[in-house]
A protein has these predicted regions:
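Compositionally biased terminal segments of proteins
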Residues: 1-233
Length: 233
C-alpha cells in the first residue's frame, strides 16, 4: 500500500489517537497472507477524546513534508479533511480524516479549501455520528502492520451498515454508484473468511438489528463467491 511505511514511521506512538478504516482491509489481509483490492487512500477516524497537541503537530509536519497540493475541509459535522496529490511519491496518494467534533488541526499556512462531500464520505460520516457505531469502533481497535486499524470484527458491521445506507439512498432515487454499493457487501463476505469462528464482539441492539437486516437482504441475493475471489483453505 503506497505510503503506509512512511505513515507508520511518522505516527509511531500515536496509535491511541486514531483508527484506520480505509486501508485497514489491505493490512489485515496482508497479515493473513492474502491480497486485497488496491487502496490509494488512507481513511482515519480521529479519536477526539484522546487527541494530543503533539498529534496535530506530527500531522501537519507530515502534510508539509509530503508536499500535499490539495488540502480541503468540509463544513458541519463530523469534520472531514482530505489531502491529495503529494509531491513526494513515498507518501500516501490521499489522506482522509474524520472527526466527530471540532478538533484542533488548524494551521495558518494550510490553505484549506471547501470540499464537496460524495456519497461514500456522507455515508461514513452518518455512521460515525451514530453513538453505537462510534463505540463499536473505539472498542474494536487492533494493530496490523504496526498501524492502529479497525479490527475484522469491527469492519464487518461497519461495511454492512454502509451497504444498507447506500442501498437505501439508491432505492430512494439518489445517484449512488452501484459499484460502491456492491463493494461493501463483497467486502463483508471476504472479511468473514478471516474470522476464526469464536469471535463474539460486543454489539448494541441497534448494531445487531442492522446486521440482521443485512443478513436478510444477503439471503435474498447472495454474493457470487467466485466473483469476490474468496479462497478456501
Amino acid at each position: 500500500m503506497r505510503g503506509i511505511d512512511k505513515f507508520k514511521e511518522r505516527f509511531a506512538g500515536h496509535d491511541g489517537e486514531y483508527v484506520l478504516i480505509g486501508g485497514a482491509c489491505d493490512l489485515l489481509f496482508g497479515e493473513a497472507g492474502q491480497d486485497f483490492r488496491a487502496t490509494k487512500d488512507l481513511d482515519l477516524v480521529l479519536l477526539v477524546e484522546a487527541l494530543t497537541p503533539e498529534f496535530g503537530q506530527v500531522f501537519w509536519d507530515f502534510v508539509r513534508e509530503g508536499g500535499y497540493e490539495n488540502r480541503q475541509k468540509s463544513s458541519g459535522k463530523p469534520q472531514f479533511y482530505r489531502f491529495s496529490r503529494p509531491e513526494d511519491p513515498a507518501f500516501p496518494a490521499m489522506l482522509e480524516l474524520f472527526a466527530r467534533t471540532d478538533v484542533s488541526l488548524r494551521d495558518a499556512e494550510s490553505g484549506l479549501m471547501p470540499i464537496h462531500i460524495d456519497d461514500e464520505v456522507s455515508s461514513l460520516s452518518a455512521i460515525l455520528l451514530d453513538e453505537d457505531y462510534y463505540r463499536l469502533l473505539v472498542e474494536n481497535r487492533a494493530s496490523a502492520g504496526g498501524v492502529a486499524v479497525l479490527s475484522v470484527e469491527g469492519l464487518i458491521p461497519f461495511k454492512a451498515k454502509a451497504w444498507l445506507d447506500l442501498s437505501a439512498r439508491r432505492a430512494g432515487g439518489q445517484a449512488v454508484d452501484e459499484k460502491s454499493v456492491k463493494k461493501h457487501r463483497n467486502d463483508v463476505c471476504r472479511l468473514a473468511t478471516l474470522l476464526a469462528g469464536g469471535e463474539r464482539p460486543a454489539m448494541s441492539e441497534g448494531v445487531r438489528a442492522d446486521m440482521r437486516r443485512f443478513l436478510e437482504a444477503y439471503e435474498s441475493d447472495p454474493v457470487d463467491l467466485c466473483f469476490v475471489k474468496i479462497t478456501f483453505q
